[in-house]
Curated annotation (Swiss-Prot):
Lineage of producing organism: Bacteria, Pseudomonadati, Pseudomonadota, Betaproteobacteria, Burkholderiales
A biological-process GO annotation: amino acid catabolic process
Enzyme Commission code: 4.2.1.90
Site (Transition state stabilizer): E338
Name of the featured protein: L-rhamnonate dehydratase
Organism: Burkholderia ambifaria (strain ATCC BAA-244 / DSM 16087 / CCUG 44356 / LMG 19182 / AMMD)
Name of the gene: rhmD
Amino acid sequence: MSMPTIRAVRALTVRGGGADYHDQDAGHWIDDHIATPMSRYPEYRQSRQSFGINVLGTLVIEIEASDGTVGFAVTTGGEIGAFIVERHLARFIEGQRVTDIEKMWDQMFYATLYYGRKGVVLNAISGVDLALWDLLGKVRQEPVHQLLGGKVRDELEFYATGARPDLAKEMGFIGGKLPLHHGPAEGDAGLRRNLDALADMRSRVGDDFWLMLDCWMSLDVPYATRLAHGAHALGLKWIEECLPPDDYWGYAKLRRDVPRGMLVTTGEHEATRWGFRMLLEMECCDIIQPDVGWCGGLTELMRISALADARGVLVIPHGSSVYSYHFVATRHNSPFAEFLMMAPQADRVVPMFDPLLLDEPVPVGGRMKVPDTAGFGVRLNPDVRMQRPYEH
């Protein structure tokens, strides 16, 4: 079988529900009073959208092969990401064989090194990489998890991230991760409110249900340490992404100082094997949480996972729906997965990328079998309005 070559790359943008999951209507739990790095400023404390968390929007990347097969993926990046894909990255993709994913990744990364390395450039590279894996799966008529070496488990088990872990327990999830609401700028009163909220949720879910706190880069080491010790009596399983991603020294100190048995996790906003190498070599955390749509795509996530596995560190990818599910199913050091509760009140299970994707699987009773359909097994919704702001 001769492999087709890549004929065209297209970068599209979408507003509203999609890969930029923060781009939600008013009243959604994800835009509530949640601690962020901007919470130090009172005017940006009540709503995360007030400081522009949803400004990028969704980036959709389509890659068309010479036989007419189209692979696609979605990530965060919007118009900025579309410009990077169309005006810079496309030259490294078009004309290549669909199997040459390693070469294409390498050229995209090193060609953007002088202005990239992390952030929206890596989002764009990640999106292209995921679209290439989707395309290869469709050309070969195999699911992506088969391309990665095959499943090591038949079923995935999930914890839920959202405002209502008590409801997540009723739905069959193994645990619930709460957003932290108050940061250091709100003082001791805010710290007490954080612990009171955790205590209230513990009383609702009982002693045997996992509870975790998502701190979204909003704390400093002293505050995070106090929070961890206060939460220990309430059975907190882990404390997540307390510090800015580049504060490896702070994470290393925090991990030494938290109560024995409490896990420190981070990596959602880290990228590439080199960033995660720092986290691992400096012993910053117990679990790394790369986002496959931001860290460099599946090609890079496999390298990151191998580094972690050699050190006995778990890899629990951040959200990402099907793009992480296919990966988690193939790795022993990813024993469970995250599900983002995207219903406005976190009171029901809805697809993470709804309405952008069709056929997107969701957990039932906190569990899911990863589909065996070709590629990632999802389709773009033709009723969602997309724009192509740039061409090449």
